Amino acid sequence: MSSGLDLELSFSQSLQGLGLSPQMAHLIWLPLPMLLVLTAAMVGVLVTVWLERKISAAVQQRIGPEYAGALGVLQPMADGLKLLVKEDVIPVRADGLLFTLGPVLVLVPVILSWLIVPFGQNLLISNVGIGIFLWISLSSIQPIGLLMSGYASNNKYSLLGGLRAAAQSISYEIPLALAVLAVVMMSNSLSTVDIVAQQNGAGLLSWNVWRQPVGFLIFWICALAECERLPFDLPEAEEELVAGYQTEYAGMKFALFYLGSYINLVLSSLLVAVLYLGGWGFPIPVEWLAGWLGQSVDAPLVQVITGSVGIVMTVLKAYLLVFLAILLRWTTPRVRIDQLLDLGWKFLLPIALGNLLITAALKLAFPVAFGG
């Protein structure tokens, strides 16, 4: 069962201890989950954009951002401020309503998906029992926003970019879902908290990446394609489509696409860490750590250390994958659209289906090792 802390219950009890009624405590709590999610997402984007600019500069033997803060750490904030004050332009022949709704439909599902990510053993906003199903459902909304943006712009490059984005997203959504289903089958749960808890038995050796190496690779490749990262950035290929479905956008509407892309990258990396790399789990069993400290596993000192370091472990694993994604972007060439679709439908889909069937067979044959 869930080992995460019910933040709503703890927050409500704290406010009730100050003399507030349960109803008032609940009303105060209502906006806080989204505020926490937005804060975490924005911080993740700022760090990722800074890393992207510095790593790309290192790959190309440049210095990169240097003047906006120490080592250019404030450059992402300067970029965001610039986009914020730019004029919001809607093309004359564009469909204004759809043109405005498109970026919103791209960004909102990605932000909502953060609600199901456990950042640590005692840091979980919403332990939804069907968290994985909710995430897959939300991610299926994004192609609608991309296609809507391309169509509403009344621009041939935008339309082609939107069509490419929708085709790419649909093509890679299916193998990604099949890869996740194999993990769900082993964990006997759709809850992200339960999936992490199932991997914390023997430290590093109990991580799902060892039992699902093929699923791990399929998920990571599909996640890069869903985030439209090189070598899969066909929808916005500058040499072919100017900027794809983003061509006619400026100011904050363009910034919403920018935010959605980077928030999705950080989210995908966090989900890889949760599903395959043990989430907040230590590389060593917690019992060993408690033994070295001369404490029991349930001792307050051990609980504080494991809770604090668990958050760091989750973020560290995620940003290791973010670093890999950034490095791939600046060191690999773009694939053609036919190669991209062939990879999704003719290669990854059959392998993901085979991996799911093999996992089911192994679960029946070796129930202890595969979560029977």
From Swiss-Prot:
Alphabetical list of PROSITE patterns matching this protein: COMPLEX1_ND1_1, COMPLEX1_ND1_2
Q: Which reaction does it catalyse?
A: a plastoquinone + NADH + (n+1) H(+)(in) = a plastoquinol + NAD(+) + n H(+)(out); a plastoquinone + NADPH + (n+1) H(+)(in) = a plastoquinol + NADP(+) + n H(+)(out)
GO biological process: what's one of them?
Answer: photosynthesis, light reaction
Task: Write out the annotated subcellular location.
Answer: Cellular thylakoid membrane
The residues forming a coiled coil are none
Q: Which family does it belong to?
A: Belongs to the complex I subunit 1 family.
Q: Tell me the function of this protein.
A: NDH-1 shuttles electrons from an unknown electron donor, via FMN and iron-sulfur (Fe-S) centers, to quinones in the respiratory and/or the photosynthetic chain. The immediate electron acceptor for the enzyme in this species is believed to be plastoquinone. Couples the redox reaction to proton translocation, and thus conserves the redox energy in a proton gradient.
Name of the featured protein: NAD(P)H-quinone oxidoreductase subunit 1
Native organism: Prochlorococcus marinus (strain MIT 9303)
